[in-house]
């Protein structure tokens, strides 16, 4: 099985919260797709709570689109990582890491303005696979943490995993 790009970076050297360009690719029609690693937690030291990450998934996707879409950028998807340390964001375009970081901070501020769990989008059994597994309080605590710590940039050239550690 081929080694995925996300497993070629040294997770012991990642900062969090931090933005990283995980991958770029060009479609046959010439559009650039960029995948960002939005790392909320330091790998193997912190983890996002399951209800909080789920609620954040519902809120974050809309807020990020509100702030970032336009001027040649369109978000395709924002999905939580299986390890629960962050999200992957795939988009058409090439916004800078700083632009993404600023958008992320603005989105976290938006999360704090949600006043009631009933205001979480798509929070019903028809649109959500585990609609009872939510916590606005946990999502807002995650947002507070990001705002307090700010968002750094993780550079791939600083995180390249030593070949000797592959499959260690």
Swiss-Prot record:
- Taxonomically, the superkingdom here is Bacteria
What keywords would UniProt list here? Autoinducer synthesis, Iron, Lyase, Metal-binding, Quorum sensing
Cofactor info, note text = Binds 1 Fe cation per subunit.
Q: Which GO terms describe its molecular function?
A: iron ion binding; S-ribosylhomocysteine lyase activity
Q: Which PANTHER family match?
A: S-RIBOSYLHOMOCYSTEINE LYASE (PTHR35799:SF1)
Q: Cite the binding residues for Fe cation.
A: 54, 58, 128
What is the annotated signal peptide range for this record? none
> Record's family?
Belongs to the LuxS family.
Q: What GO biological process terms are annotated to this protein in UniProt? A: quorum sensing
Protein name from the UniProt record: S-ribosylhomocysteine lyase
- Necessary cofactors: Fe cation
Identify the EC number(s).
Answer: 4.4.1.21
Q: What class of enzyme is it?
A: lyase
**Assembly with partners or alone:** Homodimer.
Q: Which reaction does it catalyse?
A: S-(5-deoxy-D-ribos-5-yl)-L-homocysteine = (S)-4,5-dihydroxypentane-2,3-dione + L-homocysteine
The UniProt function text for this chain reads: Involved in the synthesis of autoinducer 2 (AI-2) which is secreted by bacteria and is used to communicate both the cell density and the metabolic potential of the environment. The regulation of gene expression in response to changes in cell density is called quorum sensing. Catalyzes the transformation of S-ribosylhomocysteine (RHC) to homocysteine (HC) and 4,5-dihydroxy-2,3-pentadione (DPD).
Species the sequence originates in: Neisseria meningitidis serogroup C (strain 053442)
User: What gene name does this entry carry?
Assistant: luxS
The family database entries (SUPFAM superfamilies) matched by this protein are listed as: LuxS/MPP-like metallohydrolase
């Amino acid at each position: 099985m081929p080694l995925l790009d996300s497993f070629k970076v040294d997770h012991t050297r990642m900062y969090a919260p931090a933005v990283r360009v995980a991958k770029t690719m060009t479609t046959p029609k010439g559009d650039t797709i960029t995948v960002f690693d939005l790392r909320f937690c330091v790998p193997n030291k912190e983890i996002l709570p399951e209800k909080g990450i789920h609620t954040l998934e519902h809120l974050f996707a809309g807020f990020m689109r509100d702030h970032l879409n336009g001027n040649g950028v369109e978000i395709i998807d924002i999905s939580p990582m299986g390890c629960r340390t962050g999200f992957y964001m795939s988009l058409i375009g090439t916004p800078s890491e700083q632009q993404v970081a600023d958008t992320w901070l603005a989105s976290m501020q938006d999360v704090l303005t949600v006043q009631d769990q009933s205001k979480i989008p798509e929070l019903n059994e028809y649109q959500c696979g585990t609609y009872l597994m939510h916590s606005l309080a946990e999502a807002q605590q995650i947002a507070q943490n990001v705002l307090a710590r700010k968002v750094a940039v993780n550079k791939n050239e600083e995180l390249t995993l030593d070949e000797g550690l592959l499959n260690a």
